[in-house]
Amino acid sequence: MTGTCRHTRRILLATLFSLVTAAPALGAASATASKSGDTFTHSEVLVQAESLFGKGAKGMADVIEKAFKEYGQPNAIIKGEEAGGAIGIGVRYGKGVLVTKGGATRSVWWQGPSVGFDIGGNAAKCFTLVYNLRDTEKLFQRFPGVEGSLYFVGGFSLNYNRTDDITLAPVRLGVGWRQGANIGYLHFTPKRELLPI
């Protein structure tokens, strides 16, 4: 009888040990599944971008692929339009719709100044990948440009703006001419504002 009790106790201890050591792995797996379920896949982003830029827009897939390689899957996107101009000091104004992976939408506006060697004017469609936005209210702040992050392919441009751990990757396709080097930021607001600062 004592041999049977020892054997049963060993089986129970082994089972308990297996459950305790497997629990962190199960938790990590569910966290990963939850995280990937809260983000847009590459193909979902391409479908959303094509709805703004048009199907088969040359260069669009390349700039989106670059953002995916550098930052992974976004958990929100902004589809909109913007216009701006500069003679040394520039301004940019935009309006769009924030779309979260859960399907919630919200109108947003952005504006921002720039200072530098910059001249010209332009209007653009703007598709922004948003990373690490856990609360949509956190979008409404200033996002400085990330130095050295400008990338061009086939008329499309990509750059990054970042505050804390939230990163924005605006993809633009526009008309007009604006040339130069500048520094600035984008300020997102829940309603239209005329002052770009």
Protein language model annotation of sequence segments:
Residues M1-R6:
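N-terminal secretory signal peptides that target proteins for export/translocation
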Residues R9-L13:
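N-terminal export leaders
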Residues A14-P24:
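Bacterial N-terminal signal peptides
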Residues S30-I197:
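Small-residue-enriched, tightly packed secondary-structure blocks
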